């Protein structure tokens, strides 16, 4: 393993942490409707649980309503039940074979709770990134111990890893700020 391998590996892992954080943020409801909100809803499809996107078409009807059109008529009730039980605080209404999912307006108190959740998720993501930095620095120290690189090379590589860490932590902070602004916008 070389210094380049360590740096490349840690950067890829940090990027994956950012992607996972973005996915977590997408699940947090803001006042506006977006189809990503229902991505993790699982529907009972002939005995097996499948993502809602595999049994229905998701569209935005307007800024506050998601339209869900199951591909099979007999799935309408099951899809509606799955949305209702997904613990998202949503109350779907069926009109024929179209399920309308209106987004209720968030109360001020709920907005504050959601910003706390966003901050907490952000901290978790930053801790994960810092843990990756620690792992990379330990790998570099092992390379020095095994006499594969000099201490100067290790120090330079450590500085590079720190720069990567700072960059990714700043990206998390930016995502948190953006999501908080989105939540607090009435």
Curated annotation (Swiss-Prot):
Subcellular location: Cytoplasm
One Gene Ontology biological process: cytoplasmic translational termination
One GO cellular component term: cytosol
Gene3D superfamilies per the UniProt record, alphabetical: 3.30.1360.40, Ribosome-recycling factor
Family (UniProt): Belongs to the RRF family.
Main function: Responsible for the release of ribosomes from messenger RNA at the termination of protein biosynthesis. May increase the efficiency of translation by recycling ribosomes from one round of translation to another.
Name of the protein in question: Ribosome-recycling factor
């Amino acid at each position: 393993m070389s210094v380049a391998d360590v740096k490349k590996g840690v950067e890829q892992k940090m990027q994956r942490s950012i992607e996972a954080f973005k996915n977590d943020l997408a699940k947090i409801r803001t006042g506006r409707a977006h189809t990503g909100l229902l991505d993790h809803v699982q529907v009972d499809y002939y005995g097996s649980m499948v993502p809602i996107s595999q049994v229905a078409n998701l569209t935005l009807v307007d800024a506050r309503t998601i339209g869900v059109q199951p591909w099979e008529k007999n799935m309408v009730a099951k899809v509606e039940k799955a949305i209702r039980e997904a613990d998202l605080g949503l109350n779907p209404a069926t009109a024929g074979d179209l399920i309308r999912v209106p987004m209720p307006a968030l109360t001020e108190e709920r907005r504050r709770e959601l910003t706390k959740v966003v901050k907490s998720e952000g901290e978790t993501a930053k801790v994960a990134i810092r843990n990756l930095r620690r792992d990379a620095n330990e790998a570099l120290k092992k390379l020095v111990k095994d006499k594969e690189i000099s201490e100067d090379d290790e120090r330079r590589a450590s500085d590079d890893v720190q720069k990567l860490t700072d960059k990714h932590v700043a990206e998390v902070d930016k995502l948190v700020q953006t999501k908080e602004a989105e939540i607090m916008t009435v």
